[in-house]
From Swiss-Prot:
GO terms for cellular component: tRNA methyltransferase complex. It comes from Clostridioides difficile (strain 630) (Peptoclostridium difficile). The keyword tRNA processing applies. S-adenosyl-L-methionine binds at E45, E70, D97, D119. Its EC number is 2.1.1.33. Belongs to the class I-like SAM-binding methyltransferase superfamily. TrmB family. It catalyses: guanosine(46) in tRNA + S-adenosyl-L-methionine = N(7)-methylguanosine(46) in tRNA + S-adenosyl-L-homocysteine. The active site is at D119. This is tRNA (guanine-N(7)-)-methyltransferase. GO terms for molecular function: tRNA (guanine(46)-N7)-methyltransferase activity. Substrate binds at K123, D155, T192, E193, Y194, E195. Pfam families: Methyltransf_4. InterPro entries: SAM-dependent_MTases_sf (IPR029063), tRNA_(Gua-N-7)_MeTrfase_Trmb (IPR003358), tRNA_methyltr_TrmB_bact (IPR055361). PANTHER family: 3-DEOXY-D-MANNO-OCTULOSONIC-ACID TRANSFERASE/TRNA GUANINE-N 7 - -METHYLTRANSFERASE, PENTACOTRIPEPTIDE-REPEAT REGION OF PRORP DOMAIN-CONTAINING PROTEIN.
């Protein structure tokens, strides 16, 4: 089924010139500190959705720079509107595809990657599209600094099992694994819109962190 586009979303999104980047993103490769005008650590969320998670983090941590990447313009617009309403100065939004990150980021340019409730691509023939597939993990390994981390959350148990296996097989250090985040002792959880909905329905949320090995 073809996704229905919201009329005027493209134009409105691009009107937020303070926040939104779509064209010539590759020219910022290795120069994101200049774009942010500081040398603070850079954290990126792939598939930011409506933006509750990343904008909350940006409010809580003004000494960290955040980049939110999203391909769907309608939901990205909602995320940008949240940032604009709060007048955030430590966040940028990339209107682009995760598969192009090596064009966007220099080696060791990022400190942390967030992946929240990504498409599970359930059929085996689609496994390479999963954002925790080894092909993506290799790219993350390149753009993350030494000791950089991936923080991953999903409601899909099969995707979580797949992800743990892929992460371990690619020589990352797994830590802080939770099989039921809502009933765990983890105190610093910032939720997404999806997560709030799932938790209200009593669904389990799976979470882990993966640390890059030197």
């Amino acid at each position: 089924m073809r996704r229905r586009r919201k009329k005027g979303a493209d134009e409105k999104l691009l009107s937020y010139t303070k926040y939104v980047l779509r064209d010539d993103i590759d020219k910022l490769k290795g120069k994101w500190n200049l774009k942010f005008r500081n040398d603070n650590p850079i954290h990126v969320e792939f598939g930011t959705g409506k933006g509750k998670f990343i904008t909350t983090l940006a409010k809580q941590n003004p000494d960290i720079n955040y980049i939110a990447m999203e391909l769907k313009e309608e939901v990205l617009l909602k995320a940008v509107e949240k940032a604009d309403a709060s007048n955030l100065n430590n966040i940028l939004f990339l209107w682009g595809d995760v598969s192009n990150i090596l064009d966007y980021f220099e080696a060791k340019e990022l400190s942390r990657i967030y992946i929240n409730f990504c498409d599970p691509w359930p059929k085996n023939r689609w496994s390479k599209r999963r954002l925790t597939h080894s092909g993506f993990l290799e790219m993350y390994n390149r753009v993350l600094e030494d000791d950089g981390e991936i923080h991953f959350k999903t409601d899909n148990e099969k995707l979580f099992e797949f992800s743990l296996n892929e992460i371990a097989a690619n020589n990352w250090l797994l830590k802080n694994i939770s099989l039921d985040l809502g009933n765990s002792e983890y105190e610093n959880n910032v939720t997404t819109e999806y997560e709030d909905k799932f938790m209200s329905q009593g669904m389990r949320i799976f979470r882990c962190e993966a640390k890059k090995r030197n």
